[in-house]
């Protein structure tokens, strides 16, 4: 009898505990969710902080705005230094080119330039990149911005080439999103998308992959 009593008591307690857990689980999960929401809330910048960040963005954009020009074949120079005779260097990399594309669409998003200038700059950059000598579709790591020739020694950087293709996907998404709102520029946008898609499809990373060291 004692054994039966213990069994029934254990069974009832077990059932009771399960019942309590079943009842309070929604409350526990709700509390956890609220705590996560509080932790993930983004603290917004005040006006002074926002003005400060925008000012930095404008001054950063000035570099691209000044040097993305016909003189440099719309290939953004690698760097600029005030304290040397030749302040600007006549070389660029695939990562630099990709960053210049992102700088252009960011300048549009921040309303530093209008949509027409944005599309014109993207077109000038991409049409010049089309004419650059490549290896299996991959951009070489360094080019002369005046002659558009690869710098010696010629080599491919998997990191920089991968960066560039990643930037192309970002620009592609941007163009697809703005196309709906800009019917007057639809043909130009379609042409840019065609250039980008061809560049992505023609960039072959397989020769850079070492199958013996997976």
Language-model segment annotations:
Residues 1-213:
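Acidic, mature catalytic/reactive cores of soluble proteins
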């Amino acid at each position: 009898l004692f054994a039966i009593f213990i069994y029934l008591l254990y069974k009832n307690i077990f059932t009771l505990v399960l019942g309590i857990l079943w009842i309070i689980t929604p409350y526990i999960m709700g509390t956890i969710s609220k705590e996560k929401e509080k932790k993930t809330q983004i603290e917004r910048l005040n006006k002074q902080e926002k003005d400060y960040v925008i000012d930095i963005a404008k001054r950063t954009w000035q570099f691209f705005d000044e040097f993305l020009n016909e003189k440099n074949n719309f290939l953004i120079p690698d760097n600029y230094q005030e304290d040397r005779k030749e302040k600007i260097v006549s070389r660029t990399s695939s990562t630099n080119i990709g960053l210049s594309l992102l700088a252009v669409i960011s300048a549009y998003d921040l309303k530093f330039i209008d949509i027409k200038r944005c599309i014109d700059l993207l077109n000038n950059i991409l049409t010049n990149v089309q004419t650059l000598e490549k290896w299996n579709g991959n951009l070489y790591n360094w080019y002369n911005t005046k002659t558009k020739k690869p710098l010696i020694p010629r080599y491919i950087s998997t990191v920089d080439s991968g960066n560039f293709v990643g930037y192309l996907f970002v620009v592609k998404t941007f163009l697809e999103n703005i196309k709906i709102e800009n019917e007057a520029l639809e043909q130009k946008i379609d042409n840019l998308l065609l250039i980008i898609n061809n560049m992505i499809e023609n960039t072959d990373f397989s020769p850079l992959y070492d199958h013996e060291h997976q």
